[in-house]
């Protein structure tokens, strides 16, 4: 459960991401594909090379979903319901992959926002991404 301080930290950090959200989303995906090659199996139709338009496009989708979640932090299940359905019923993504991407997102944010990425912000973002992952996997059952 996100505390009021966590919500404040997440919103402040995401505000700092600003117009770079899509770029950071794509970078996190690239990190995931390089660090955890088995995740590539969900994207057989993508050009997964560095800077590909498909990775950039999906990175933007990831970032847009996170922006939506930040904006609806008190009602993520409702806000992310369609995305949860998509991943559970159509794409059938193994839930562990959300944890892998979350880790890569944290690394990406730490690299780009070193001054803002305090231990408290790190903990809040980690809890937030875990909450998003829980919502996205809630319809698997």
UniProtKB/Swiss-Prot annotation:
InterPro entries: Globin (IPR000971), Globin-like_sf (IPR009050), Globin/Proto (IPR012292), Hemoglobin_a-typ (IPR002338), Hemoglobin_oxygen_transport (IPR050056), Hemoglobin_pi (IPR002339). The modification Phosphothreonine is found at residues 108, 134, 137. GO terms for molecular function: haptoglobin binding; heme binding; iron ion binding; organic acid binding; oxygen binding; oxygen carrier activity; peroxidase activity. The modification N6-acetyllysine is found at residue 16. Red blood cells. Pfam families: Globin. The modification Phosphotyrosine is found at residue 24. SUPFAM superfamilies: Globin-like. O2 binds at residue 58. Keywords: Acetylation, Heme, Iron, Metal-binding, Oxygen transport, Phosphoprotein, Transport. The modification N6-succinyllysine is found at residues 7, 11, 16, 40. Coiled coil: none annotated. Heterotetramer of two alpha chains and two beta chains. Belongs to the globin family. This is Hemoglobin subunit alpha-1/2. It comes from Mandrillus sphinx.
